């Protein structure tokens, strides 16, 4: 909810480009209702504001589930990274850790970057970064058809 509120109310992003990554929480701010879905995969939904250049990449149901799913897809054993393989225990670790600095997560992300959902996530981020104001909705939809 913090990400959504910051994008909606921040003067710098209010009328410019904004991209947020959010979990698919049960209770979303009302601002989300102003967005339409461009495409979705098993865990990733791309949404665009009706009239503004605002995008959300919504992770369903949450980032920890996506990470565990990607690890399973590429055959990564979470214990090799000293991380839990059960969602409840893994979520506890992710809530207590600054994953940007944690070498376990750096190694894990490096090893799961070839998973289908991580590739999609990276492609969406890269495309939107390079096409902030000249995106093509069909090109964005095509990323989900791979």
Label each region the model flagged.
Residues 1-146:
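Acidic, divalent-metal-binding catalytic cores of TOPRIM
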